[in-house]
């Protein structure tokens, strides 16, 4: 049994809770950024760095709430260094304590079986008639036949089991796990739990627990069943009284069959009366309790605790599933972003490509502006996505594919990629991209990570040089970690001459790029190699023209 008194309590909760207090069950991916509601990631960055694909790659969670928590950690990462450190402490405890890991796995698997029933209770709509166990359509409204009795029994039993199983977990060392388990145990002391555990009494339209009910007040408890013994007993007593009354009265007239006729006529009234009672239960008990349970912060917190434990197990299992080195980054609390990684591999490719070429990442105070040059298809974009995805995984508190890593959490991550112009905004590509860069610049701080895939495209060379130079100098003075991918080696030479920035280029051998980044500035793009590989070289164009009618010599 867990100690009821938490020590070293930390603020690990994020609001609002995932369990919605509305009438609709939230989707697993509902926490993705929106134009009007952004966090560390904006919408464009979220899409550009393939966050959904990253979730699919690392997701090993078994519960709906666990997957929702994990997705939120990626879509809306925290930049609280202390919280990430505590989360890592819990992951280390899982790795060091196989017995605890096994106990938590059993706990989550036990909860998976009944988790769905809780959501059916909280968000179900009941249409009467014959009861159904599964909703008609799980993607929209959770509509069921019946009056919600079955869902009430199973859903409340899940809540009871959650508390009992959590209380039976072995002691834990890490403050993060201790707080999660304690939240579930504490839910057992709440009024919501008392109502879910039962019995429930309805007095003057209000719900009372066994402790709240006046001791000597004879009030029947609510029974989630179509068969109500007290109403049935009253009805049978009335029918029996009428039967004997008419039977005796008509017996004096020699018409004893009249009593049997009355008895037969009353039988069809039984299901009508039961239906009326069930409809009353649904409107006056089930739905009001459903609303009360949905709005319970104690229940939402307990369910979220289950999800956060499942998330930890998922991060642990992901690390075990990848061949090669995996590490928990050292999390630093500082006023300026930094990221240093040894032998970094791309999180989306590390598992399926064991021979993936690793690269080091060094983004610190001395390397705050990094400019990457090199041939097309040489690995520049993959390197940039590796940087951002490792930063993102680090800010979930989880493992990253590398030998060693150290990072300061970023409060903003921006990734700008080339986009076409917007006709509805009346601007071409150059103006559209410049507007994006402007928004990124004015929202950046020293704790920001900014990646610009090309800059000031769509204008003359001279204007591009001037604009790119003052924009990059602006980011450098701002203190944001800034990475530019470009073919503009003249810009690199100009900034390098002023001692601004560090420079990497794609290593290129006679047989092609190695996908390794080395110091230096590339002066060639090897576009001819890419064109030849795609079958669109000068020779390919000439051969095609020669095959056209009237073009053959």
Question: Where are the predicted features?
Answer:
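Structural signal for well-ordered, non-membrane alpha-helices
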Residues: 92, 307-310, 438
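Transmembrane-cytosolic junction motif
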Residues: 1-11, 273-293
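Conserved amphipathic alpha-helical "coupling/scaffold" segments
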Residues: 1-231, 294-300, 305, 327-329, ...
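Transmembrane alpha-helical hairpins and terminal membrane-anchor modules
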Residues: 217-287
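ATPase nucleotide-binding head domains, primarily ABC-like/P-loop NTPase cores
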Residues: 262-274, 312-553
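Charged/polar positions within long, soluble alpha-helices
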Residues: 96, 161-164, 168, 238-245, ...
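Transmembrane helical bundles of ABC transporter permease domains
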Residues: 283-324
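Short amphipathic alpha-helical segments with heptad-repeat character
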Residues: 275, 289, 293-296, 300-303, ...
């Amino acid at each position: 049994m867990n100690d009821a008194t938490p020590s070293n309590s930390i603020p690990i909760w994020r609001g609002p809770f995932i369990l919605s207090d509305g009438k609709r069950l939230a989707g697993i991916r509902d926490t993705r950024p929106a134009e009007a509601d952004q966090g560390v990631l904006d919408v464009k960055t979220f899409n550009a760095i393939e966050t959904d694909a990253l979730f699919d790659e690392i997701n090993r969670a078994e519960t709906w709430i666990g997957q929702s928590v994990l997705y939120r950690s990626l879509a809306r990462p925290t930049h609280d260094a202390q919280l990430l450190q505590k989360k890592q402490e819990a992951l280390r405890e899982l790795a060091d304590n196989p017995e605890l890991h096994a106990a938590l796995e059993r706990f989550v698997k036990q909860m998976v079986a009944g988790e769905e029933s809780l959501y059916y209770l909280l968000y179900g709509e009941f249409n009467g008639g014959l009861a159904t166990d599964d909703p008609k359509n799980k993607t929209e409204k959770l509509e069921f036949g019946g009056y919600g009795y079955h869902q009430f029994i199973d859903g409340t039993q899940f809540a009871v089991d959650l508390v009992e199983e959590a209380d039976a977990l072995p002691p834990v060392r890490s403050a993060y796990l201790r707080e999660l388990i304690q939240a579930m145990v504490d839910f057992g002391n709440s009024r919501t739990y008392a109502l879910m555990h039962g019995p429930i009494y309805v007095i003057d339209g209000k719900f009372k627990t066994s402790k709240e009910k006046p001791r000597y007040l004879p009030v029947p408890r609510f029974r989630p069943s179509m068969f109500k013994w007290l109403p049935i007993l009253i009805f049978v007593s009335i029918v029996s009284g009428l039967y004997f009354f008419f039977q005796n009265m008509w017996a004096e007239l020699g018409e004893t069959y009249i009593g049997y006729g009355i008895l037969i006529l009353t039988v069809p009234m039984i299901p009508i009366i039961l239906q009326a009672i069930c409809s009353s239960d649904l409107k006056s008990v089930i739905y009001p309790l459903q609303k009360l349970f949905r709005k319970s912060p104690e229940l939402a917190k307990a369910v979220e605790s289950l999800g956060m434990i499942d998330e930890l197990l998922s991060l642990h299992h992901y690390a075990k599933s990848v061949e090669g080195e995996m590490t928990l980054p050292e999390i630093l609390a500082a006023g300026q972003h930094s990221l240093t990684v040894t032998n970094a591999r791309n999180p989306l490719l590390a598992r399926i490509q064991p021979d993936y070429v690793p690269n080091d990442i060094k983004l610190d105070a001395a390397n705050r502006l990094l400019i990457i040059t090199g041939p097309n298809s040489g690995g520049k974009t993959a390197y940039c996505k590796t940087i951002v995805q490792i930063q993102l995984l680090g800010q979930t508190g989880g493992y990253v594919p590398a030998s060693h890593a150290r990072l300061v959490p970023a409060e903003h991550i921006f990734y700008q990629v080339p986009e076409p112009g917007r006709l509805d905004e009346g601007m071409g590509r150059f103006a559209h991209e410049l507007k994006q860069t402007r928004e990124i610049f004015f929202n950046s701080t020293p704790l920001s990570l900014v990646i610009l895939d090309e800059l000031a495209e769509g204008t003359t060379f001279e204007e591009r040089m001037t604009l790119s130079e003052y924009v990059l100098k602006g980011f450098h003075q701002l203190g944001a970690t800034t990475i530019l991918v470009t073919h503009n080696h003249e810009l690199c030479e100009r900034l390098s001459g002023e001692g601004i920035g560090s420079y990497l280029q794609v290593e290129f051998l006679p047989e092609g790029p190695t996908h390794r980044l080395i110091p230096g500035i590339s002066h060639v793009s090897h576009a001819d190699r890419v064109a030849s590989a795609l079958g669109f070289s000068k020779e390919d164009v000439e051969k095609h023209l020669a095959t056209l009618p009237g073009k053959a010599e």
